[in-house]
Structures are given as C-alpha cells and as structure tokens.
C-alpha cells in the first residue's frame, strides 16, 4: 500500500527534525506531520472500506444461533462509555451465516449506534433478537442519540453518504451488501421518543431431516 510509506516518512521527518528546530517551528512541524499522519490513516480506512464494498466475497455459510453471535460481539463493548442493553430471545434463532461477515455486520451496527449516542446524557444502545411477523430472525438495534437525518434515511445505503465528519460513507453499503448476500434485508428508522433504529431480518434456518 503506497499510503504506508507516506505515513512512515511523515513520522520519521517529525522525529528527526524536532530537536533541530526552535520551539515555534517545531510546533509547526509537529502539527503539519500530525495532519499528514491522520489524513493518511483516514485514506487507508477509506481504501479498505472501498475494497470491502467492491470485492466479491467468498462466503462460508454455517449454522449459527444469532443470540450467540450477538452475545460474542457485545462482550467487546463491555466497559465502554455507552451502555449496551441486550434483550435476546429465550429460544434459539437459527440462521445460515458466514461467521466473519456476520460479525463484521454486528460490529459496524453496534459501533455506529454507540457513536451516535455519544451526545446523550447517558448513552445507551438496546439490542434485541427475536422474530418478525414473517417468521424471519430479527435483530433490532436502537440508541438514544439524535436519530438519522432526512438525507441519511433516504440515502444511507448509497456509497459515501454519511452523517459523521470522519466517516467513509461505506459502512452501511457494505452491511447492506452482506445482509442481502445472506438473503436478508435491512432498514433504518427514527424513534418517536428520539434516537435511531436499525432492523435486520434474516431467513430462519429450517433443518430438514431425511
């Protein structure tokens, strides 16, 4: 990746010249190289996001209980500034899914929900697993943030559309692509009492016996 040498060169430049400059110019150098490093990091993130969006993945489908997948990923968010409140199903919710791809979906949705709730007095994300009226396995993730803008509600799954100042705008399009490859669907909405919701419906895995 040609971006990595740029990032390393900026860091090396700052390290080599810092002690050779007076304080004023050292600060200018530090700010400039810091800007380069941060912008290169943002570009690398965007390149990786575009790669995930553009490539045709090779999925390995296995039987999973969505309850368990959600539990596993939520463990990574324990102790954070945002409180996650799980409301999982009291019975297994079987799906056929690629483990890595589905964890990527869950991470993206949970991370976005937590970031969107940061401005709330007590940031909270409610995560529920159950079934919808069609009998599909349903994941619902709602936060107590300010909700989606009108533009996001209409164009969230279009590449490069984002509410976040540092977002790539490729997270939700990648999520939608993965969900559709699993035969599911995803939708966004705002709650009447405030906050945003993401709903993902996936085909229920029905095992047949010969």
Indicate residue ranges for each PLM-predicted region.
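Short alpha-helical Gxxx[C/S/T] motif in the catalytic ATP-binding
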Residues: 171, 175
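Acidic ATP/Mg2+-coordinating residue in the GHKL
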Residues: 143
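Detector for a conserved hydrophobic position within an alpha-helical segment of the HATPase_c
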Residues: 179-180
């Amino acid at each position: 990746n040609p971006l990595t040498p740029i990032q390393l060169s900026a860091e090396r430049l700052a390290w080599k010249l810092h002690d050779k400059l007076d304080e004023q110019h050292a600060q200018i150098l530090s700010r400039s190289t810091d800007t380069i490093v941060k912008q290169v990091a943002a570009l690398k993130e965007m390149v990786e996001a575009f790669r995930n969006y553009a490539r045709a993945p090779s999925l390995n489908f296995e039987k999973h209980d969505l309850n368990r997948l959600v539990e596993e990923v939520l463990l990574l968010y324990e102790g954070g500034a945002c409180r996650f409140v799980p409301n999982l199903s009291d019975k297994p919710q079987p799906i056929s899914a690629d483990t890595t791809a589905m964890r990527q979906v869950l991470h993206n949705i949970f991370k976005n929900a937590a970031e969107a709730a940061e401005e709330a007095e007590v940031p909270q994300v409610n995560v529920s697993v159950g079934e919808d009226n069609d009998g599909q396995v349903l994941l619902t993730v709602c936060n107590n943030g300010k909700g989606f803008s009108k533009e996001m509600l209409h164009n969230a799954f279009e590449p490069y559309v984002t509410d976040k100042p540092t977002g790539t705008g490729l997270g939700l399009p990648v999520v939608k692509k993965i969900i559709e490859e699993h035969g599911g669907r995803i939708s966004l909405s705002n709650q009447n009492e405030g906050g945003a919701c993401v709903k993902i419906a996936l085909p229920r895995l029905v095992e047949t016996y010969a």
